[in-house]
């Protein structure tokens, strides 16, 4: 016997973020969040969190996609060339930004040096997206997610740090 979660088509994926991630963000920002920025993989984080944040307030939702199909962002989808997840709702995003995936390793290196955080490639891409949004607005409270750490990406660690 086995269980296949099918996170790309399982409504429980986005519902978990609707019920938990969005509420945590709303509570921790005291409702001051103005922009939510997240990359699209299974799309559960973006769809669930985005739906709930839209209900709670006037939050701009910015989805992120890699700049080409052959990118280093494990888990992310280049939706123009990939199979669209069944749970994806393309009406939710106010804006979609295309992330230059070549800058991801520089962000990982910089954040590790200056903040002592070892973020994953997808986390670095989310951070790039949040920084892009920050450069386009006068003020606001921008939130993104860092879903995992660099621990799972031995080849990336080797390429960036030689370890």
What annotation goes with each model-predicted range?
Residues 50, 96-97, 109, 131, ...:
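Generic hydrophobic alpha-helical scaffold/packing signal
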């Amino acid at each position: 016997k086995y269980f296949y979660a099918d996170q790309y088509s399982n409504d429980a994926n986005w519902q978990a973020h609707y019920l938990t991630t969005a509420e945590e963000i709303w509570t921790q920002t005291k409702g001051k969040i103005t922009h939510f920025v997240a990359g699209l993989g299974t799309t559960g984080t973006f769809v669930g969190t985005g739906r709930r944040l839209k209900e709670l307030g006037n939050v701009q939702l910015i989805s992120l996609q890699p700049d080409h199909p052959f990118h280093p962002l494990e888990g992310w989808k280049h939706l123009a060339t990939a199979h669209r997840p069944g749970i994806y709702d393309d009406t939710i995003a106010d804006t979609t930004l295309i992330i230059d995936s070549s800058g991801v390793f520089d962000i990982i290196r910089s954040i590790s040096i200056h903040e002592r955080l070892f973020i994953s490639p997808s986390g670095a891409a989310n951070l790039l997206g949040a920084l892009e949004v920050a450069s386009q607005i006068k003020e606001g409270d921008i939130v993104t997610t860092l879903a995992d750490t660099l621990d799972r990406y031995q080849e990336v660690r080797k390429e960036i740090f030689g370890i």
